[in-house]
Design a protein with these regions (language model features):
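Bacterial N-terminal signal peptides
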Residues: 9-18
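Structured C-terminal helix/loop/strand segments within mature extracytoplasmic catalytic/sensor domains
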Residues: 24-57, 65-67, 209, 213, ...
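A short, well-structured edge-of-sheet supersecondary motif
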Residues: 52-90, 292-293
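Short, well-structured active-site flanking segments
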Residues: 111-129, 140, 231-235
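Sec/Tat signal peptide C-region and signal peptidase I cleavage site
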Residues: 19-23
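Bacterial N-terminal signal peptides that target proteins for export
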Residues: 1-9
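Active-site SXXK
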Residues: 95-118, 131, 302
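Active-site-adjacent helix/loop patches that line small-molecule binding or acyl-intermediate pockets
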Residues: 37-52, 56-60, 68, 123-204, ...
Length: 331
């Protein structure tokens, strides 16, 4: 016979297990969860692609008088769906994201929409469009609130702040579950500065700012472009928002269509080429993440991040142009 204390112990353990299961189920309702069928892409370094990228970066860094650590770049050729050829320069170096992080928030939101954990509304649709098409910081703040069930406000006592920060890290946990490493995607973007709990979350001196690598950024864009991150309908919706008409006569120096990688297509006279991208710029950073399809069959992701050369608009498109030219010549 079981002793009363033994029976009580069994009941307590059973209750704890049930509670844990219920809690996990509850978390799954709000967490951004990796699909059971998800398989991370297979990437293999290509010596030819590496030589092309190394020369392009070296030429631009020399001409632009870059210091070590001021540029990173990654290229992925996605023509073979079974195995992507890749090359990188400082591809695992963490750099401040600028607005490129908005692509990560878009992808996370589409995951939640596909899973039925978030419902699309006209306001959410407006925010998503403005975040990607116009790179609106205010729209990004709203999207991150929706994704993490957090909101800006005053600083909080430590225990309350830790609970808030755990929720704010929801997007980080999602990408970590997919095998993304060395990134931090948990902060809002601002035109000026963060205040209150947003500054508290940044640890006041920016130690917890958004950070990305060109490797992680290129991987995500490649997964979106090949329609493997979410279903085809949602993938096409993301690509629709990132589509850039590089043949337009936009005079904005920060135009995501005719500057950044778009300028490379203009300079190379790449008639018929298609461009999808998300750029980012601040007073110190100038980045672009671009996917290009050309009439001769190229399907390539090119991501270039630069720091301390934000007012020198020529460097990002120069790297892209050199890579695209070399790829054409090596066919």
């Amino acid at each position: 016979m079981f002793k009363p204390t033994r029976i009580l112990s069994i009941l307590v353990v059973s209750c704890l297990l049930v509670s844990a299961a219920v809690a996990q189920k509850g978390r799954d309702k709000i967490e951004i969860v990796k699909p059971k069928v998800y398989v991370a892409p297979l990437l293999e370094t290509s010596p030819n692609l590496q030589a092309i990228l190394d020369k392009a970066v070296s030429d631009v860094m020399t001409a632009g008088k870059f210091k070590p650590g001021e540029m990173a770049a990654t290229v992925i050729d996605v023509r073979d769906p079974a195995k992507w050829a890749t090359a990188s320069f400082e591809g695992e170096r963490q750099l401040y994201t600028a607005s490129v992080v908005k692509m990560f928030y878009m992808a996370a939101l589409e995951r939640q929409l596909e899973d039925g954990k978030v419902t699309m509304t006209k306001e959410l649709e407006r925010g998503l469009k403005d975040m990607i098409v116009d790179s609106s910081n205010e729209a990004t703040q709203y999207i991150l609130d929706v994704l993490t069930d957090t909101s800006s406000g005053s600083e909080l006592p430590q225990k309350q702040f830790e609970a808030w920060q755990y929720k704010r890290n929801r997007v980080n946990r999602f990408f970590s579950s997919l095998g993304y490493t060395n990134i931090n995607v948990n902060q809002k973007t601002f035109c000026e500065d963060a205040y209150g709990i947003e500054q508290q979350s940044r640890k006041y001196k920016g130690q917890n700012r958004n950070m990305l690598t060109t490797n992680a950024t290129a991987r995500l864009l490649a997964e979106i472009a090949t329609r493997r991150f979410v279903n085809e309908i949602r993938s096409n919706a993301m690509l629709g928002l990132m589509s850039r008409d590089w043949t337009t006569t936009d005079k904005d120096p920060n135009s995501q269509s005719v500057n950044f990688t778009g300028k490379a297509l203009i300079d190379n006279k790449m008639t018929g080429a298609k461009l999808w991208s998300k750029a980012g710029w601040t007073s110190k950073a100038r980045h672009d993440a671009a996917y290009i399809e050309t009439t001769d069959g190229q399907k390539v992701v090119i991501v270039v991040f630069t720091e301390n050369h934000a007012n020198e608009f020529e460097h990002v498109p120069a790297v892209a142009a050199k890579v695209l030219n070399a790829l054409k010549e090596s066919k």
